[in-house]
Amino acid sequence: MSHRKFSAPRHGSLGFLPRKRSSRHRGKVKSFPKDDASKPVHLTAFLGYKAGMTHIVREVDRPGSKVNKKEVVEAVTIVETPPMVVVGIVGYVETPRGLRTFKTVFAEHISDECKRRFYKNWHKSKKKAFTKYCKKWQDDTGKKQLEKDFNSMKKYCQVIRIIAHTQMRLLPLRQKKAHLMEIQVNGGTVAEKLDWARERLEQQVPVNQVFGQDEMIDVIGVTKGKGYKGVTSRWHTKKLPRKTHRGLRKVACIGAWHPARVAFSVARAGQKGYHHRTEINKKIYKIGQGYLIKDGKLIKNNASTDYDLSDKSINPLGGFVHYGEVTNDFIMLKGCVVGTKKRVLTLRKSLLVQTKRRALEKIDLKFIDTTSKFGHGRFQTMEEKKAFMGPLKKDRIAKEEGA
């Protein structure tokens, strides 16, 4: 029989071809939200680092629904977002060929973790990046030139973006090289945008100045890499019958004799994962504050709610697996996001006008789970664990050694 008995849709989408390793590790923003001059000046994106997942309990606020006023348990992802540092301003002009850079101005002082991004091997380099450039800010001729640049940007540019980098020293990661990106400034006139950006040169921008509670955002990143995979795993094609000669996790017919080539649309083995992806409509459940010192005391209770008053941080017992402790500001997103732990993620304001009731729903968290994510966690805090377990042998030994 030369034809199949039943028709079936093809396996796997051709919309994501070529399925190869991403050329960039950090998610690229290919389009920023549309500018609206009537709104106040604001940033449209931010960088964060995926820490891990937990679950929450909340009450649904959806009048008319069967689940209204009922408690639901939902999975959430914690993305650590330490403040970003603004180190430059870029002006763009609109041309018939699209946007073109007009002027770029960098700050006088740039940290080493940012400079590392401009070198392949920081250890062997002379570390001279920006040493000549920063002198512009110190002599009169340089200052005049910078002022001239800012004025010409106000006159000719239509789009203003800032150059900002992350602060790796605040994170529990080994990497020292900061991630650097351009973030579009929206709202107000071009002059207002430029003044706003100028005021914030060398300043830190926290995440709560970019996003708000209950906002819908987009997450751009590179997925978890899986390596070289067979056709069944990569394209989810059907396994052949058990008695098939020469393997069954294959495609039986890869095309006609002529044309004597294999079409691009035929499922083949190859790279799976580590692809650049944009996921839209991730709801922010909480924008949490990092650890802070108040009246000489370290305040950690950023996972307490109105219903759960226990003094606990967002970190599960033992920290997030394969990440560590989240000590900075963080964002809690509904559901999962792309990438492995420690992966840098680009968080962008939504391109769409959100009108759905689910998108506009107010989120009121009742409980955030902080049990250990390594094994079957039972305790929310160390105090709860100590109260249940009682005095342990290791505590007694430590006491004796101390005495």
UniProtKB/Swiss-Prot annotation:
Cytoplasm found in the keyword field: yes
Family to which this protein belongs: Belongs to the universal ribosomal protein uL3 family.
Crosslink (Glycyl lysine isopeptide (Lys-Gly) (interchain with G-Cter in SUMO2)) position: K39, K224, K226, K286, K366, K386, K393, K399
Modified residues annotated as N6-acetyllysine in this record: K136, K286, K294, K366, K373
Transmembrane regions listed in the UniProt entry: none
UniProt-recorded name of the protein: Large ribosomal subunit protein uL3
Keyword Metal-binding: no
Gene3D superfamilies per UniProt: 3.30.1430.10, Ribosomal protein L3, domain 3, Translation factors
Stretches the record annotates as Disordered: 1-36
Coiled-coil portions: none
Bias kind Basic residues: ranges: 18-31
Lineage of origin: Eukaryota, Metazoa, Chordata, Craniata, Vertebrata
General function of this protein: Component of the large ribosomal subunit. The ribosome is a large ribonucleoprotein complex responsible for the synthesis of proteins in the cell.
Residue numbers of Tele-methylhistidine PTMs: H245
